[in-house]
Amino acid sequence: MAEFKRYLELDISQQHDFIYPLIFQEYIYALAHDRGLNRSIFLENAGYDNKSSLLIVKRLITHLITQMYQQNHFFFSVSDSNQKKNLGYNTNFYSQMIFEGFAVVMEIPFYLRLLSFLEGKERVKSHNLRSIHSIFPFLEDKFTYQNYVLDIQIPHPIHPEILVQTLRYWVKDASSLHLLRFFLHEYPIWNSLITQKKSIFYFSKKNQRFFLFLYNFHVCEYESIFVFLRNQSSYLRSISSETFLERISFYRKIEREVFTKDFKAILWLFKEPFLHYVRYRGKAILASKGTSLLMNKWKYYLLNFWQSYFYMWSQPRRIHINQLSNHSLDFLGYLSSVRLKPLMLRSQMIENSFLIENASKKFDTLMPITTMILSLYKAKFCNVVGHPMSKPAWAALSDSDIIERFRALYRNLSHYYSGSLKKISLYRIKYILRLSCARTLARKHKSTVRAFLKRLGVGLLEEFFTEEEQVFYLTFQKVSFTSGELYRRRIWYLDIICINDLANYE
């Protein structure tokens, strides 16, 4: 950490919490293009060129601020098709360069806090917990004994000014915050960053680092209430939560604390020790062993927290209270539920025998076949009721490329839904993709499916017998299972780190 600070010359800047001067350091832009805070950052020759010269950066920022005050808008307009050149330079190109460097600078205070937190602690070298599938064993272990869940949709992005005010807790440098305001005014699409897929796709190609930083910070602020509650109550302490960057208190714009004065008066509402929280992207789940009254209090508390701290109206319908015993949880593409499994026990006492009816809770994960067919329909693999269709967009490819694309798609789906308790839904998806592949090939060769398969043989579609299906037999070949038990086995993989939209699959 000392080497990191010395390389970035942070000791002097940190004396007054200044990070704005780092924007004028040329190696920041080399670091931005290196795409990481831990790749080649200690090399003496960072590999940057004279395009990121200090003089250019100073002139552009000065001109940016002047234009902002004179014309009341950014002159670096993304939608400006003319792309005028000022100061002898392409302003759109250099504004993008400053944007990328600024994203690195804004990450530094958080990165230093993380390094400080990890100092003296043993790092976990395993990356297994990065997998999305690692959530489901946790749900199976913890949620089986819970009664109610809060199904939470994190509210839409807040006003940019509120975001800046919230960021002041972590970043004390006023100059950097002013520059952040300029960038947020330049990109008004921030308000649709989370809710509209087109905006996410747009930012994935341009300014990805900066907007992912804002998105993660935005969501992290919503989650920080749970860490705050844990610190205030001994009932809510949890070892796993110490990985969060913790806040001490929450503030309004006016100079008074929101929760600390009246906190003891309302803390009794949440003395339930069995609380479990998981989140993926904009959807979160809070489970409790308590009653519906307790969950209603949690819902009321979260709504009031969002409204008082973020100055925004959060609709109550974004939080749903569901009972696990009679509700399926739609999370991460699976339908998860807790059902009672009846169990009959025979007890023998001397000459008498008794039948004891018992029931145990079991956590089920199922593949939502209706949702999957709708996704395949949107991607033009089948019609709305699940009848396979040809894929015209792929008909121009070679036969091997067409087969490989369909095979790769099914392999990915079977890989992800290997945790489904019943495989019949997955077999139906396999049928749709196999026949869609055959119809695409027949369309390309201007033939019917029957004539095409008769000419080339049905063995052509055996390519769809993927290694995923062989895993079941290779894994459990030494264990005695009936066919029904093997059919219901679940496998969770530890290499799945993201979910892509099927409609955008190419």
From Swiss-Prot:
For this entry, list what GO says about its biological process. Answer: mRNA processing; RNA splicing; tRNA processing
Q: Does the keyword Transit peptide apply?
A: no
Grouped into one coarse class, the protein's main location is: plastid
Q: Which domain of life is it from?
A: Eukaryota
GO cellular component, alphabetical, reads: chloroplast
Supply the Pfam families for this chain.
Answer: Intron_maturas2 (PF01348), MatK_N (PF01824)
Enumerate the UniProt keywords alphabetically.
Answer: Chloroplast, mRNA processing, Plastid, RNA-binding, tRNA processing
GO terms (molecular function) for this protein are: RNA binding
Q: Indicate where this protein resides in the cell.
A: Plastid, Chloroplast
What's this protein's function?
Answer: Usually encoded in the trnK tRNA gene intron. Probably assists in splicing its own and other chloroplast group II introns.
HAMAP family for the chain: MatK
Provide the family line. Answer: Belongs to the intron maturase 2 family. MatK subfamily.
Q: What is the name attached to this protein's record?
A: Maturase K
Highest classification ranks of the organism: Eukaryota, Viridiplantae, Streptophyta, Embryophyta, Tracheophyta
Which gene specifies this protein's sequence?
matK
